[in-house]
Amino acid sequence: MTDVIDAKPEEAKKVPPEVEDEDSGDESAPEASAAGGEATKKKKKKKKPKKKKKAAEQSEPPRVGLSKLFPNGIYPEGEIQPYKDDNAYRTTSEEKRYLERITCEDPDETYQNIRKGAEVHRQVRQYAQRTIKPGMTMTEIANLIEDGTRALVEENGLEAGIGFPTGLSLNNCAAHYTPNAGDTIVLQQGDVMKVDIGVQVKGRIVDSAFTMTFEPTYDKLLEAVRAATNTGIREAGIDARLGEIAGAIQETMESYEVEVNGKLIPVKPIANLSGHSIDRYTIHAGKSVCLVKNDDQTKMEEGEYFAIETFGSTGRGRVVDGGECSHYARKVDAPHVPLRLTTAKSLLKSINKNFGTIPFCRRYLDRIGESKYLLALNHLVQQGIVEDYPPLYDQQGSMTAQFEHTILLRPTVKEVVSRGDDY
């Protein structure tokens, strides 16, 4: 520890008495004294400049709530993409700009809610990208991400918090894996890990994902999926048809190959996974953006939110359920079923209070004090009240990758709210 030396004020310098001479009675002396007195007075009046308040900065690991970093409540806008073709007029339309202003005045609809969630996402994921290393357990990685999310979004019940369980799916597991209690899986040097993070503010969910590798073998797989996601974003827009967007995604994805052990393997889009529309407190709102061309003539509409996500694989390009389930969500249209199990009634009450229709995992139930709940949870699933989302796997030995962004179809422009410098 550095020794701090006390800085004592300098003692007044003693002027040695001068030898008196015949001029010691000079009349100018009083004038000089008076001038010195005036100077002393002026010095006393001089005020020290006020120190400017230092702007709040994010900590490492990130724990500073965003309201402290953005005290005016205005959060960074996402990437803006103008509409094209028949919708190009929207960018300059007075009518559409007026509609956008009205939307922003509604405290529930304001874009600031989703932009806050997006900024939380960017700061948390960029810390995760710097920090995650082989040798860490899946539980350590999940906690690293979720602790940061809770702190930055300033978790407050259903008002703000985690948007869904942190996905950490490895290798041929494409989606819906997060560690349950007691999980001992350790991240390996050769793993391909999909990191899917959700943040919600007043029910506005930001859903964005990226893929991490620690050696170059599967770089082309990641490049293919990232390019396919950006193609989907480019083609998305008001009145865009979902089937046509899917065709563009497929074309981009299939233009890539990966070389593994001297063999070229085509990258396939995972045909039975898709992007989706998002509603308040509802992660899957009904519309699907598939990854292979189809005849779906459904159109995207003004004001809608979409998660544009693509998955690529070196395997079959199809996934099946497998492994221990961790992800669950209460159904939006859950039936009113009389529950005979007292434990199921109690668990449902807890789910409604803490999560509503926001997806959750077993670790989150542990965190709120629930125990011995598996029988009750399975009963709620069997009764159609809660949906389970088991992990999804392509064939053994294959590798899968994912990239995803949340977009907002504003009346005037398309905003990629979760875009960052990283992807």
From Swiss-Prot:
Transmembrane segments: none annotated. Residues 41-54 have a biased composition (Basic residues). It is an enzyme of class 3 (hydrolase). One of its GO terms (biological process) is proteolysis. Its cofactor is Co(2+); Zn(2+); Mn(2+); Fe(2+). Binds 2 divalent metal cations per subunit. Has a high-affinity and a low affinity metal-binding site. The true nature of the physiological cofactor is under debate. The enzyme is active with cobalt, zinc, manganese or divalent iron ions. Most likely, methionine aminopeptidases function as mononuclear Fe(2+)-metalloproteases under physiological conditions, and the catalytically relevant metal-binding site has been assigned to the histidine-containing high-affinity site. Residues 1-89 are annotated as: Disordered. Cotranslationally removes the N-terminal methionine from nascent proteins. The N-terminal methionine is often cleaved when the second residue in the primary sequence is small and uncharged (Met-Ala-, Cys, Gly, Pro, Ser, Thr, or Val). This is Methionine aminopeptidase 2. The lineage of its organism: Eukaryota, Fungi, Dikarya, Basidiomycota, Agaricomycotina.
